[in-house]
C-alpha cells in the first residue's frame, strides 16, 4: 500500500499602511492642504521571462493603489489580500528587471512561509479545506486554502526591493503518500499522526542561543552604519502596538502573526531622522524566502520613510524630506511575521514582545509543529525551507526514518510530482545532496531547522545516483543492509528560469518491514508561484501511488492512477461504566400538569446507595392525575442518606388513583430528624388502593426539614388493613390542655378487647384545641399488638380542626420495624379534611404500661351521645383519678364485664353539674352488674354515640318492669353508699 502526504508552503506579501495628515500654508497660492500618509502596497507582476521595458510613474498606476490587494490576482478567489481596514495606500507601478533606478518606485517581493498539513484520506476529491491534488492548478490551490488552514486574519504587506530583484509570489505545499506491495485485496491505510494533541507540549520552545543569526540576506542593511539624523523613537506620540493571532500558531500550516503599529510623528522631525521597531527573536519577516525586506511608508505617491532590517532582525525606518514640509503626520504599519525555526525548535508556549521604544505589546501563543508521517515502519517528512528567486535555487530538508525504526534495504528517491509542470531541475549538474546520520532521534528539531555541524556527514558512505531523468536515488548501505537511526537528507537544487511551472517535488522512502513486505511512503513538497498573491496556505493529503512491480525495485516516475476508495466498517462495543455522584441542587419549579396513566409494572430491584444531598426547593404545582396502576415489586434496598432540606410548597392536587400493589416490607430504620414545618394543605384525593408490597429496607437517615405547606385534602379511602403489632411503651409526657370540644358522634362499635396494661405515665399537657368533627365510623377491630416503644416527646400544638370523615379501610399489614428516632417538631397546621373511612382492623394487643399521670384539665364538654356498645372486657386496673365532669348522656348499653379492680380514689369533687338528660332506653339484655367478672363495659366511657332514629323497643312484660325497678333501687343504694364514702373521705381531710 502506498500513502502520500502533501505539504504546502505559503508566501506572505507584506503591506504597510501609513496615514499622515499635513496642514501647511502655501504662500504662493494661499491654500491650506493636509495629507494622510499610508504605507505603500506594491504589487509585483513580473514573470520569469523578464522584459526590459522601462515604466514611468504615471497617474493611472497611482490611482489603482487602494485596490491593489483585491485585484492583483484576477484569476484567483482568495480574499487574503484585503487591506484590513488600513488607510488607503498609493500603488507604485511594478518594476521589471531593468537598469533604470528610481527611489520612489519600489517593487514588491512576496514572502513565502512554509505551510503543512497532514491527512489520511486517500485519492479523494479535495474540499476547500483540503485543496490539493496532482491535477490542481497551483494558483487555485493557494487561493482556495489561503483562509482555511491558518488561524490568522488575512492581511497584505508590501515589501521593499530594488527593481532588479522583483520576484513572483511563492506558495509552498507539501504532500506525503505511502504505499506497500501487499496483495491488492489487502491494501493498508496509512496511520497518520498529524493531530497537534499527539505531540508533547513543552512550556517554552525558544532556543536560548544568542545572538540570533538570520538565515537570509538583508536588503539594504544601512542601519548598522552611522545615521546622519537623530533617533526619534521615543519622541513618537500616540503609539499603539498590537499583536494579532490565534492562541495557537501552526508554522507548518502557513501560520503567522500580525504586528500592528500606529503613531504620530513630531513636527520637529526632519529628513534623516529614524525610529526603530523591535521584532522578537522568535519571529522573522521573511518566511522561507532568502531575502527579507520592508516596504517604504508612502504618503500618496511620495515616500515618507524607507525601512531596512538590521542584523538583529529589527526594523529601522528613516524619514525622507517629506516631513520637512509637513506637520501632524500620522502613520499606521501592519507587518506579518513568521515563527523563526532556528529560535523556536519545538512545540511549546512562546511569549512574543514587540514595540516602538518603551511602548510594547506582549502575547503568549502556543507554537505547534506538525509531526512527521509514519506508515508501518516507514517514516518520512520533507520541507522546502528556503527559496532564492534571484539565483533560482531552493533548499529541501528531508527527515528519513525519524521514528528510528528498523528498515531493511532502505532507499530514498526524489523526483518531480507526476502530472505537474514542475520547474525543478534534478540531475547531477543542478542537484547537490548531503546526507547526515542522527544517532538520537531526540536530536531532531520539530521545526526542521538543521545545523549541519551537529550531525555526522555520511554523504561519502551512501550511494547517490540519478537513474532516470529528473530523479535521484539515495541508498543507505550498512553492514547488515538495514538502518535503525534517523537520517537527514539536504537537497540543494535549481529551478528552471524558463519554465512556467511550479516547484513540485516528491520524496519516496522504500524498505522492508518486519514481515518482509516491501513498502513505500511518499512526501510531496510543492511551491506555487502566484503573481501578486498575498498569501498561500497548504495542507497535507495522502494518496496511494502505484506499487513497485517486484520487491526491492524502485519505481521511476509513477503514472496517473485513479482509485475509488470505499470503506466498510462494523463495530461491536461492550462498555462497563460505573458512576459515583453527589449532587447539590437548588430548584424553583412551577408546574401545572394533568396526567392519565395506566401502567402495569413488575420490577425486582436491589439497590445499595449512599447519597448526600443538600436541596433547597420551592415548588408550586397544580396537578390532576388519574392513574390506574398495578405493580408487583420486590425490592431490597440498603440506603444511608443524610439530607438537609428546606422546602416551601403550595400544592392543590386532585387525584383519582386506583392502584393494586402487593407489598411485603421489612424495614430497619434509624432516623434522626429535626423538622420545622408550617403546612397549609388543600388536597382532594379519591384513592382506592389495594397494596401488597414486599420490601426489605435498611435506612439510616438524618434529615433536617423545614417545610411550609398549604394543604386542602378531601380523601375518600377504602383500605383493608390487618395489623399485628407488639409494642412496649414507656412514655413520659407533660401535658397541659385546655380543650373546648363540641362533638356530635354517632357510633356503633362492637369491640372485643382483652387488655392487660401496666402504665406509668407522667404527662403535663397544655393544649388549646377547637374541634368540630362529624364522624361516621363503623369499625370492627381485632387487635393484637405487642409494642416496645421508648419515646420522649415535647409537643406544643395549637390545632383548629374541622373534620368530617367517612373512612372505610381494610388493611393487612405485616411490619417489623426497629426505629430509633429523635424529633423536634414545631408545626402549625390548618387542616380541613373530609374523610369517609370504613375500617376493619383485627388487633391483638399485649401492653405493659406504667403510668404516672399528673393532669390538670379544664374541660367544658357538651356531649349528646347515643351509644350502643357490646363490650367484653377483662381489665385489671389500679387507678387514681380526679375528675370534674358535666355530661348529658343518653345511653343504651349492654355490658358483660369481668373486672378485678383495686381502686384508690381520692376525689375532691366540687361540681356544679347541670345535666339535662333525656333518656329513653329500652333494653332486652342480660345486664351484668359492674362487679361481674365478665361482659362488663361502661358505655359512658366511649365517645362513639350514635343518634338512633329507630322506634323505641317494646318495654316487655310486667315481670321485666319489676326487675328493672329492683335494679334501680339497688343502683340508688349503691349511689348513696358511694356519696357517703366520698363525704367521709372529705371529712377526714
UniProtKB/Swiss-Prot annotation:
Keyword Secreted in annotation: yes
Residues modified as Pentaglycyl murein peptidoglycan amidated threonine: 955
Annotated Polar residues bias: 71-105, 163-205
One Pfam family per UniProt: Big_8
Composition bias, Low complexity: 47-65, 106-132, 143-162, 566-598, 918-936
Keywords: Cell wall, Peptidoglycan-anchor, Secreted, Signal, Virulence
Compositional bias annotation for Acidic residues: 547-565, 599-917
Motif (LPXTG sorting signal) on chain: 952-956
Example GO BP: cell adhesion
Region entry Ligand binding A region, spans: 40-542
UniProt KW Protein transport keyword: no
GO cellular component: extracellular region
Matching InterPro entries: Adhesin_Fg-bd_dom_2, Adhesion_dom_sf, Fibrogen-bd_dom1, LPXTG_anchor, SDr-like, SDR_Ig, YSIRK_signal_dom
Signal peptide boundaries: 1-39
Compositional bias (Basic and acidic residues): 943-952
Coiled-coil segments on the chain, per record: none
Membrane topology qualifier: Peptidoglycan-anchor
Localization: Secreted, Cell wall
Motif (YSIRK-G/S signaling motif): 9-20
Disordered: annotated span: 34-205, 529-960
Propeptide position ranges: 956-989
Role noted for this protein: Cell surface-associated protein implicated in virulence. Promotes bacterial attachment exclusively to the gamma-chain of human fibrinogen. Induces formation of bacterial clumps, which diminish the ability of group IIA phospholipase A2 to cause bacterial phospholipid hydrolysis and killing. Significantly decreases macrophage phagocytosis possibly thanks to the clumps, clumped bacteria being too large to be phagocytosed. Dominant factor responsible for human platelet aggregation, which may be an important mechanism for initiating infective endocarditis.
Family per record: Belongs to the serine-aspartate repeat-containing protein (SDr) family.
UniProt-recorded name of the protein: Clumping factor A
This protein's encoding gene: clfA
Amino acid at each position: 500500500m502506498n500513502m502520500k502526504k502533501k505539504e504546502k508552503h505559503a508566501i506572505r506579501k507584506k503591506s504597510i499602511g501609513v496615514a499622515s495628515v499635513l496642514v501647511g500654508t502655501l504662500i504662493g497660492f494661499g491654500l491650506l492642504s493636509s495629507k494622510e500618509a499610508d504605507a505603500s502596497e506594491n504589487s509585483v507582476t513580473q514573470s520569469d521571462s523578464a522584459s526590459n521595458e522601462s515604466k514611468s510613474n504615471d497617474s493611472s498606476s497611482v490611482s489603482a493603489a487602494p485596490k491593489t490587494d483585491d485585484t492583483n490576482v484576477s484569476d484567483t478567489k482568495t480574499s487574503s489580500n484585503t487591506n484590513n481596514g488600513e488607510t488607503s495606500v498609493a500603488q507604485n507601478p511594478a518594476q521589471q528587471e531593468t537598469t533604470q533606478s528610481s527611489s520612489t518606485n519600489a517593487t514588491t517581493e512576496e514572502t513565502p512561509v512554509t505551510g503543512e498539513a497532514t491527512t489520511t484520506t486517500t485519492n479523494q476529491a479535495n474540499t476547500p479545506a483540503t485543496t490539493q491534488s496532482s491535477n490542481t492548478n497551483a494558483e487555485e490551490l493557494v487561493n482556495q486554502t489561503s483562509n482555511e488552514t491558518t488561524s490568522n486574519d488575512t492581511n497584505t504587506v508590501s515589501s521593499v526591493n530594488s527593481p532588479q530583484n522583483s520576484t513572483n509570489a511563492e506558495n509552498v505545499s507539501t504532500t506525503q503518500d505511502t504505499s506497500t506491495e501487499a496483495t491488492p485485496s489487502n491494501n493498508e491505510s496509512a496511520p497518520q499522526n498529524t493531530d497537534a494533541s499527539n505531540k508533547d507540549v513543552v512550556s517554552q520552545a525558544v532556543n536560548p542561543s544568542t545572538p540570533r543569526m538570520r538565515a537570509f540576506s538583508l536588503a539594504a542593511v544601512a542601519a548598522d552604519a552611522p545615521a546622519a539624523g537623530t533617533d526619534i523613537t521615543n519622541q513618537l506620540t500616540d503609539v499603539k502596538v498590537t499583536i494579532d493571532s490565534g492562541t495557537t500558531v501552526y508554522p507548518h500550516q502557513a501560520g503567522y502573526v500580525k504586528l500592528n503599529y500606529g503613531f504620530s510623528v513630531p513636527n520637529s522631525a526632519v529628513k534623516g531622522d529614524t525610529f526603530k521597531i523591535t521584532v522578537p527573536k522568535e519571529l522573522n519577516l521573511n518566511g522561507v524566502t532568502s531575502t527579507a525586506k520592508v516596504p517604504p511608508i508612502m504618503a500618496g505617491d511620495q515616500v515618507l520613510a524607507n525601512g531596512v532590517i538590521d542584523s538583529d532582525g529589527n526594523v529601522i525606518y528613516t524619514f525622507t524630506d517629506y516631513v520637512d514640509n509637513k506637520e501632524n503626520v500620522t502613520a499606521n504599519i501592519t507587518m506579518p511575521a513568521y515563527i523563526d525555526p532556528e529560535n523556536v525548535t519545538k512545540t511549546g508556549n512562546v511569549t512574543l514582545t514587540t514595540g516602538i521604544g518603551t511602548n510594547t505589546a506582549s502575547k503568549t501563543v502556543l507554537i505547534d509543529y506538525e509531526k512527521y508521517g509514519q506508515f508501518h515502519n516507514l517514516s518520512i517528512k520533507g520541507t522546502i525551507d528556503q527559496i532564492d528567486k534571484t539565483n533560482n535555487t531552493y533548499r529541501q530538508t528531508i527527515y528519513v526514518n525519524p521514528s528510528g525504526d528498523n528498515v531493511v534495504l532502505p532507499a530514498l528517491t526524489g523526483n518531480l510530482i507526476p502530472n505537474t509542470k514542475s520547474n525543478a531541475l534534478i540531475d547531477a549538474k543542478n542537484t547537490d545532496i548531503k546526507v547526515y546520520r542522527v544517532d538520537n532521534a531526540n536530536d531532531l528539531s520539530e521545526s526542521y531547522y538543521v545545523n549541519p555541524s551537529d550531525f555526522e556527514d555520511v554523504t561519502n558512505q551512501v550511494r547517490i545516483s540519478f537513474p532516470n531523468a529528473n530523479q535521484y536515488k539515495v541508498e543507505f548501505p550498512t553492514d547488515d543492509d538495514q538502518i535503525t537511526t534517523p537520517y537527514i537528507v539536504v537537497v540543494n537544487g535549481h529551478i528552471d528560469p524558463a519554465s512556467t511551472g511550479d516547484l513540485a517535488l516528491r520524496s519516496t522512502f522504500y524498505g522492508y518491514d518486519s514481515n518482509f513486505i516491501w513498502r513505500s511512503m511518499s512526501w510531496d513538497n510543492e511551491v506555487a508561484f502566484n503573481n501578486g498573491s498575498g498569501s498561500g496556505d497548504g495542507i497535507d493529503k495522502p494518496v496511494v501511488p502505484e506499487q513497485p512491480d517486484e520487491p526491492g525495485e524502485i519505481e521511476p516516475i509513477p503514472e496517473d492512477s485513479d482509485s475509488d476508495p470505499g470503506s466498510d466498517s462494523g463495530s461491536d462495543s461492550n462498555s462497563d461504566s460505573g458512576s459515583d455522584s453527589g449532587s447539590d441542587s437548588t430548584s424553583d419549579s412551577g408546574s401545572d400538569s394533568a396526567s392519565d396513566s395506566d401502567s402495569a409494572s413488575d420490577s425486582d430491584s436491589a439497590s445499595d446507595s449512599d447519597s448526600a444531598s443538600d436541596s433547597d426547593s420551592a415548588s408550586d404545582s397544580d396537578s390532576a392525575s388519574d392513574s390506574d396502576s398495578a405493580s408487583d415489586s420486590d425490592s431490597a434496598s440498603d440506603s444511608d442518606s443524610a439530607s438537609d432540606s428546606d422546602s416551601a410548597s403550595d400544592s392543590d392536587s386532585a387525584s383519582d388513583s386506583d392502584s393494586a400493589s402487593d407489598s411485603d416490607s421489612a424495614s430497619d430504620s434509624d432516623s434522626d430528624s429535626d423538622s420545622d414545618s408550617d403546612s397549609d394543605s388543600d388536597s382532594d384525593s379519591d384513592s382506592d388502593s389495594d397494596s401488597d408490597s414486599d420490601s426489605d429496607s435498611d435506612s439510616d437517615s438524618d434529615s433536617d426539614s423545614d417545610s411550609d405547606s398549604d394543604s386542602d385534602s378531601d380523601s375518600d379511602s377504602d383500605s383493608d388493613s390487618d395489623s399485628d403489632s407488639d409494642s412496649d411503651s414507656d412514655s413520659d409526657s407533660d401535658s397541659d390542655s385546655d380543650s373546648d370540644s363540641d362533638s356530635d358522634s354517632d357510633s356503633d362499635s362492637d369491640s372485643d378487647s382483652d387488655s392487660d396494661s401496666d402504665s406509668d405515665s407522667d404527662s403535663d399537657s397544655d393544649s388549646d384545641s377547637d374541634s368540630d368533627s362529624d364522624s361516621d365510623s363503623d369499625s370492627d377491630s381485632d387487635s393484637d399488638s405487642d409494642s416496645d416503644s421508648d419515646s420522649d416527646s415535647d409537643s406544643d400544638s395549637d390545632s383548629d380542626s374541622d373534620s368530617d370523615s367517612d373512612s372505610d379501610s381494610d388493611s393487612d399489614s405485616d411490619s417489623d420495624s426497629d426505629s430509633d428516632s429523635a424529633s423536634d417538631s414545631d408545626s402549625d397546621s390548618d387542616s380541613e379534611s373530609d374523610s369517609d373511612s370504613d375500617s376493619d382492623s383485627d388487633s391483638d394487643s399485649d401492653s405493659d404500661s406504667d403510668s404516672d399521670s399528673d393532669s390538670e384539665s379544664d374541660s367544658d364538654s357538651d356531649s349528646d351521645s347515643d351509644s350502643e356498645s357490646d363490650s367484653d372486657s377483662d381489665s385489671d386496673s389500679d387507678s387514681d383519678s380526679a375528675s370534674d365532669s358535666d355530661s348529658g348522656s343518653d345511653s343504651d348499653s349492654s355490658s358483660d364485664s369481668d373486672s378485678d379492680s383495686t381502686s384508690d380514689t381520692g376525689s375532691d369533687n366540687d361540681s356544679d353539674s347541670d345535666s339535662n338528660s333525656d333518656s329513653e332506653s329500652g333494653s332486652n339484655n342480660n345486664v351484668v352488674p359492674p362487679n361481674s367478672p365478665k361482659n362488663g363495659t361502661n358505655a359512658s366511657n366511649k365517645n362513639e354515640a350514635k343518634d338512633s332514629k329507630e322506634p323505641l323497643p317494646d318495654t316487655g312484660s310486667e315481670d321485666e318492669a319489676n326487675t328493672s325497678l329492683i335494679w334501680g333501687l339497688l343502683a340508688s343504694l349503691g349511689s348513696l353508699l358511694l356519696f357517703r364514702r366520698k363525704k367521709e373521705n372529705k371529712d377526714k381531710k
